[in-house]
Amino acid sequence: VTCRVLTTVVSELTGTDGFGGHVGGDDFVFMSAPSAIDAICQTLIKRFDLVIPDFYDPEDRQAGFIDSVDRRGNHERFPIMSLSIAVVTNEHRDISHPGDVSKIASELKKVAKSRPGSVYVKDNRTNPPDSAPESTPR
């Protein structure tokens, strides 16, 4: 479902100028012109949040979570699935090494996952990737 929503939205908003795909596990990627990023992220979140509740029982949807067992066998409440989007862009700073893209994405993904619900976090820092952040990413 996630990949279908992603590829549909990217295609609708960028035509052949964008790309969306599955990296592995629960990780996906899309590439587009910076000018399309906000519209893509907002549309992805809107559509994902619209279809995902249909995969849950009515009681779980109402509660906002499911009761289940985690990987270690512990009883836990898991919230209804949401999207955490990390936006890495070269709009404000040069990214000269592919490894920096992964590093920045990882930093932003942690920030996104710390927030409730479906969100996107955009890297607006202007300093080089190897230096300390100037400000909190948004």
Q: Can you say where each PLM-predicted feature lies in the sequence?
A:
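Two-component transmitter module helix at the DHp-CA junction of histidine kinases
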Residues: 11, 49, 53-60, 117
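Short amphipathic alpha-helices in soluble, non-transmembrane regions
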Residues: 41-48
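Flexible, glycine/charge-rich interdomain/linker segments that couple
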Residues: 91-92, 111-138
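Short, conserved charged micro-motifs
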Residues: 36-41, 95-97
